[in-house]
Every structure is written in structure tokens, then in C-alpha cells.
């Protein structure tokens, strides 16, 4: 959640953290799903992609390379929506460079 917040991305829901059955109706509002651990949630993400056309990212953001790849996938999906909504495209290169500069 911290990484997404620093990237300017609002989180719709984190399941099952603090989840209620009533909140499930809001799941299709998300632009994409994140499955940081393939053992948990991958089947739901695949279902959401088939049912709602909602893409997902299944990269675990651990380590420099995977985190940079994770952010690149987010950038790609956010910019896909930005193009559809005629909004400004994002570039997270500076963020990735800044986060990995001293490692």
C-alpha cells in the first residue's frame, strides 16, 4: 500500500484485509488487480480478468529488479487507462531511479 500511495495510486480494496462482504460489489471499480503472492488471489484475479476485463499484475515487489518490474507494469496499466480517459500519462522512471539509487 505504501508503494502505491507514493506512486499516487488510490487503493480500492485490499482483500481480505478489513474486507466485508458488502465491499465485494465495488471490486469491478478497480482499473487492475495486484496479486503479490501467486498462492493467494491468483484465481480471483484470473476470474476478474475474464469476467470484467480487468488486468492483473502478479509480480512480487521484492528486491530491486522485481520492484522496478512491478512499477513498470503499474505504469503501463495506469497509462492505458489515462489514454482512454484523455488524462496525463505517468512516468515512474524518476521514482524507480530515486528508490534504487543508494542500494
Swiss-Prot record:
Give me any GO biological process, just one: light-independent chlorophyll biosynthetic process
Keywords for the protein's UniProt record, in alphabetical order:
4Fe-4S, ATP-binding, Chlorophyll biosynthesis, Chloroplast, Iron, Iron-sulfur, Metal-binding, Nucleotide-binding, Oxidoreductase, Photosynthesis, Plastid
A GO MF label: oxidoreductase activity
Binding note for cofactor: Binds 1 [4Fe-4S] cluster per heterodimer. The cluster is bound at the heterodimer interface by residues from both subunits.
- Pfam short name (any one): Oxidored_nitro
Q: Does the keyword Secreted apply?
A: no
> What broad class of enzyme is this?
oxidoreductase
Q: Give the catalysed reaction(s), semicolon-separated.
A: chlorophyllide a + oxidized 2[4Fe-4S]-[ferredoxin] + 2 ADP + 2 phosphate = protochlorophyllide a + reduced 2[4Fe-4S]-[ferredoxin] + 2 ATP + 2 H2O
Q: Which residues form a coiled coil?
A: none
- Cofactor(s) of this protein: [4Fe-4S] cluster
Q: Could you say which EC number(s) this protein's record lists?
A: 1.3.7.7
Question: What sections of the protein cross the membrane?
Answer: none
Any keyword Transmembrane helix? no
Q: Where in the cell is it found?
A: Plastid, Chloroplast
Q: In which pathway does it act?
A: Porphyrin-containing compound metabolism; chlorophyll biosynthesis (light-independent)
The cellular component terms of Gene Ontology attached to this UniProt record, alphabetical and capped at eight, are: chloroplast
Query: Its function?
Result: Component of the dark-operative protochlorophyllide reductase (DPOR) that uses Mg-ATP and reduced ferredoxin to reduce ring D of protochlorophyllide (Pchlide) to form chlorophyllide a (Chlide). This reaction is light-independent. The NB-protein (ChlN-ChlB) is the catalytic component of the complex.
* Family designation: Belongs to the ChlB/BchB/BchZ family.
**Oligomer and partners:** Protochlorophyllide reductase is composed of three subunits; ChlL, ChlN and ChlB. Forms a heterotetramer of two ChlB and two ChlN subunits.
Q: What is this protein called?
A: Light-independent protochlorophyllide reductase subunit B
Whose protein is this, by species? Nephrolepis exaltata (Boston sword fern)
Task: List the taxonomic lineage.
Answer: Eukaryota, Viridiplantae, Streptophyta, Embryophyta, Tracheophyta
